Amino acid sequence: MCKDLVWDRHLHGSTLGFIGFGRIPQCVARKLSGFDLRYLAYDPQVSPDVMAELQASPATFEEVLQQADVISLHTPLTEATHHLIGERELRLMKSNVILINTSRGPVLDEQALVEALTERRIAGAALDVFETEPLPESSPLRQLDNVVLTPHIAGYTDEFVKDFWHYSVEAVCDMAQGFLPESYVNPQAVDRCGFVRRDQD
Protein backbone atom coordinates (compact mmCIF):
# COMPACT_ATOMS: atom_id res chain seq x y z
CA MET A 1 0.00 0.00 0.00
CA CYS A 2 0.99 3.63 0.06
CA LYS A 3 3.24 3.33 3.15
CA ASP A 4 5.68 1.67 0.76
CA LEU A 5 4.84 4.20 -1.99
CA VAL A 6 3.31 1.36 -4.00
CA TRP A 7 -0.14 1.86 -5.51
CA ASP A 8 -1.35 -1.56 -6.59
CA ARG A 9 -4.91 -0.82 -7.65
CA HIS A 10 -7.02 1.62 -9.64
CA LEU A 11 -10.25 3.22 -8.48
CA HIS A 12 -11.63 3.19 -12.03
CA GLY A 13 -14.55 0.80 -12.29
CA SER A 14 -14.63 -0.03 -8.56
CA THR A 15 -17.67 -0.03 -6.30
CA LEU A 16 -17.60 2.61 -3.55
CA GLY A 17 -19.99 1.95 -0.68
CA PHE A 18 -21.14 4.71 1.64
CA ILE A 19 -22.44 3.94 5.12
CA GLY A 20 -24.26 7.21 5.67
CA PHE A 21 -24.99 9.51 2.73
CA GLY A 22 -25.36 13.00 4.16
CA ARG A 23 -23.68 16.20 3.05
CA ILE A 24 -20.03 15.06 3.29
CA PRO A 25 -20.39 11.75 1.43
CA GLN A 26 -22.50 13.50 -1.20
CA CYS A 27 -19.61 15.93 -1.69
CA VAL A 28 -17.20 12.97 -1.92
CA ALA A 29 -19.40 11.38 -4.59
CA ARG A 30 -19.34 14.60 -6.64
CA LYS A 31 -15.56 14.91 -6.36
CA LEU A 32 -15.06 11.31 -7.52
CA SER A 33 -17.48 11.55 -10.43
CA GLY A 34 -14.69 11.34 -13.02
CA PHE A 35 -13.44 7.94 -11.83
CA ASP A 36 -16.27 5.86 -13.33
CA LEU A 37 -17.18 4.41 -9.96
CA ARG A 38 -20.33 2.56 -9.03
CA TYR A 39 -21.83 4.04 -5.86
CA LEU A 40 -23.83 2.10 -3.29
CA ALA A 41 -25.31 4.06 -0.39
CA TYR A 42 -26.94 3.00 2.85
CA ASP A 43 -28.72 5.78 4.70
CA PRO A 44 -32.33 5.43 5.89
CA GLN A 45 -32.51 9.23 6.34
CA VAL A 46 -31.72 10.10 2.71
CA SER A 47 -34.31 9.71 -0.03
CA PRO A 48 -33.62 7.53 -3.09
CA ASP A 49 -34.19 10.65 -5.23
CA VAL A 50 -31.24 12.43 -3.60
CA MET A 51 -29.09 9.34 -4.11
CA ALA A 52 -30.18 9.08 -7.75
CA GLU A 53 -29.06 12.67 -8.41
CA LEU A 54 -25.52 11.51 -7.62
CA GLN A 55 -25.86 8.15 -9.43
CA ALA A 56 -25.81 6.31 -6.10
CA SER A 57 -27.86 3.14 -5.82
CA PRO A 58 -29.76 2.70 -2.55
CA ALA A 59 -28.59 -0.45 -0.80
CA THR A 60 -29.03 -2.27 2.46
CA PHE A 61 -26.31 -2.17 5.08
CA GLU A 62 -25.33 -5.76 4.27
CA GLU A 63 -25.31 -5.12 0.50
CA VAL A 64 -22.79 -2.31 0.95
CA LEU A 65 -20.59 -4.51 3.13
CA GLN A 66 -20.70 -7.46 0.73
CA GLN A 67 -20.37 -5.67 -2.62
CA ALA A 68 -18.14 -2.63 -2.15
CA ASP A 69 -14.43 -2.51 -3.02
CA VAL A 70 -14.06 0.62 -0.89
CA ILE A 71 -16.31 1.35 2.09
CA SER A 72 -16.45 4.86 3.55
CA LEU A 73 -18.08 5.43 6.95
CA HIS A 74 -20.05 8.65 7.44
CA THR A 75 -22.30 8.11 10.44
CA PRO A 76 -22.75 10.06 13.66
CA LEU A 77 -21.84 8.32 16.89
CA THR A 78 -24.97 7.21 18.74
CA GLU A 79 -25.87 4.23 20.89
CA ALA A 80 -27.10 2.53 17.72
CA THR A 81 -23.89 3.18 15.75
CA HIS A 82 -21.35 2.34 18.46
CA HIS A 83 -19.27 -0.52 16.98
CA LEU A 84 -21.55 -0.52 13.94
CA ILE A 85 -18.64 -2.20 12.18
CA GLY A 86 -17.39 -5.17 14.20
CA GLU A 87 -16.19 -8.70 13.61
CA ARG A 88 -19.41 -9.87 11.94
CA GLU A 89 -19.49 -6.91 9.55
CA LEU A 90 -15.80 -7.22 8.70
CA ARG A 91 -16.32 -10.88 7.81
CA LEU A 92 -19.05 -9.87 5.34
CA MET A 93 -16.62 -7.64 3.42
CA LYS A 94 -14.68 -8.64 0.33
CA SER A 95 -11.06 -9.63 0.86
CA ASN A 96 -9.89 -6.76 -1.37
CA VAL A 97 -11.89 -4.07 0.45
CA ILE A 98 -10.38 -0.82 1.72
CA LEU A 99 -12.25 0.52 4.76
CA ILE A 100 -12.22 4.28 5.39
CA ASN A 101 -13.36 5.89 8.63
CA THR A 102 -13.53 9.67 8.81
CA SER A 103 -16.71 9.79 10.91
CA ARG A 104 -16.23 8.88 14.58
CA GLY A 105 -13.74 6.40 16.00
CA PRO A 106 -16.11 4.25 18.09
CA VAL A 107 -18.31 3.54 15.05
CA LEU A 108 -15.61 0.97 14.27
CA ASP A 109 -14.51 -1.79 16.67
CA GLU A 110 -10.74 -1.26 16.51
CA GLN A 111 -9.83 -4.63 18.02
CA ALA A 112 -11.93 -6.43 15.41
CA LEU A 113 -10.33 -4.28 12.71
CA VAL A 114 -6.80 -5.06 13.92
CA GLU A 115 -7.59 -8.76 13.74
CA ALA A 116 -9.06 -8.47 10.23
CA LEU A 117 -6.05 -6.48 9.00
CA THR A 118 -3.51 -8.76 10.70
CA GLU A 119 -5.14 -11.86 9.23
CA ARG A 120 -5.43 -10.13 5.82
CA ARG A 121 -9.16 -10.78 5.74
CA ILE A 122 -9.51 -7.26 4.32
CA ALA A 123 -6.95 -5.46 2.19
CA GLY A 124 -6.52 -2.30 4.20
CA ALA A 125 -7.92 0.65 6.10
CA ALA A 126 -7.53 4.42 6.21
CA LEU A 127 -8.43 5.98 9.55
CA ASP A 128 -8.67 9.62 10.54
CA VAL A 129 -10.56 8.94 13.78
CA PHE A 130 -10.00 6.47 16.61
CA GLU A 131 -11.74 5.03 19.65
CA THR A 132 -9.20 6.86 21.83
CA GLU A 133 -7.74 10.13 20.55
CA PRO A 134 -4.93 10.75 20.23
CA LEU A 135 -4.21 7.19 19.16
CA PRO A 136 -2.11 5.59 21.94
CA GLU A 137 1.53 4.87 21.11
CA SER A 138 0.89 1.26 22.08
CA SER A 139 -1.93 0.79 19.57
CA PRO A 140 -1.31 -2.22 17.30
CA LEU A 141 -2.69 -0.14 14.43
CA ARG A 142 0.63 1.72 14.41
CA GLN A 143 2.51 -1.49 13.58
CA LEU A 144 0.44 -2.62 10.60
CA ASP A 145 1.61 -2.15 7.03
CA ASN A 146 -1.89 -2.16 5.54
CA VAL A 147 -3.38 0.82 7.35
CA VAL A 148 -2.95 4.57 6.86
CA LEU A 149 -3.44 6.76 9.94
CA THR A 150 -4.03 10.50 10.20
CA PRO A 151 -4.64 12.29 13.54
CA HIS A 152 -8.18 13.61 12.91
CA ILE A 153 -6.86 16.30 10.56
CA ALA A 154 -7.04 14.68 7.13
CA GLY A 155 -9.45 17.31 5.81
CA TYR A 156 -7.66 20.38 7.14
CA THR A 157 -6.57 22.90 4.54
CA ASP A 158 -6.45 26.71 4.59
CA GLU A 159 -9.73 26.71 2.67
CA PHE A 160 -11.33 24.32 5.15
CA VAL A 161 -10.43 26.54 8.11
CA LYS A 162 -11.81 29.61 6.33
CA ASP A 163 -15.04 27.79 5.45
CA PHE A 164 -15.32 26.40 8.97
CA TRP A 165 -15.41 29.87 10.49
CA HIS A 166 -17.71 31.20 7.78
CA TYR A 167 -20.29 28.44 8.29
CA SER A 168 -19.99 28.63 12.08
CA VAL A 169 -20.79 32.35 12.09
CA GLU A 170 -23.57 31.79 9.55
CA ALA A 171 -25.13 29.13 11.82
CA VAL A 172 -25.04 31.45 14.85
CA CYS A 173 -26.64 34.26 12.83
CA ASP A 174 -29.36 31.92 11.55
CA MET A 175 -30.23 30.82 15.08
CA ALA A 176 -30.22 34.41 16.37
CA GLN A 177 -32.90 35.15 13.75
CA GLY A 178 -34.97 32.09 14.65
CA PHE A 179 -33.89 29.93 11.72
CA LEU A 180 -32.48 26.43 11.83
CA PRO A 181 -28.82 26.38 10.81
CA GLU A 182 -28.37 24.66 7.46
CA SER A 183 -26.04 22.08 8.98
CA TYR A 184 -28.19 20.82 11.87
CA VAL A 185 -27.87 17.08 12.44
CA ASN A 186 -30.72 16.14 14.80
CA PRO A 187 -33.98 16.37 12.83
CA GLN A 188 -35.89 14.73 15.69
CA ALA A 189 -35.55 18.00 17.65
CA VAL A 190 -36.78 20.34 14.91
CA ASP A 191 -40.40 20.46 16.05
CA ARG A 192 -39.46 21.11 19.69
CA CYS A 193 -36.78 23.76 19.23
CA GLY A 194 -38.97 26.59 17.93
CA PHE A 195 -36.72 27.36 14.98
CA VAL A 196 -38.00 27.30 11.40
CA ARG A 197 -36.32 26.32 8.18
CA ARG A 198 -35.49 29.22 5.88
CA ASP A 199 -37.52 27.61 3.10
CA GLN A 200 -40.60 27.80 5.35
CA ASP A 201 -40.19 31.51 6.07
Predicted region positions:
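Rossmann-like dinucleotide-binding domain for NAD(H)/NADP(H)
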Residues: 96-201
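Hydrophobic, aliphatic-enriched repeat segments that assemble into extended interaction scaffolds
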Residues: 1-2, 173
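Short amphipathic alpha-helical surface micro-motifs
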Residues: 1, 23, 41, 130-132, ...
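N-proximal short alpha-helices
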Residues: 1, 19, 37-38, 137, ...
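Rossmann-like dinucleotide/phosphate-binding beta-alpha-beta segment
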Residues: 3-95
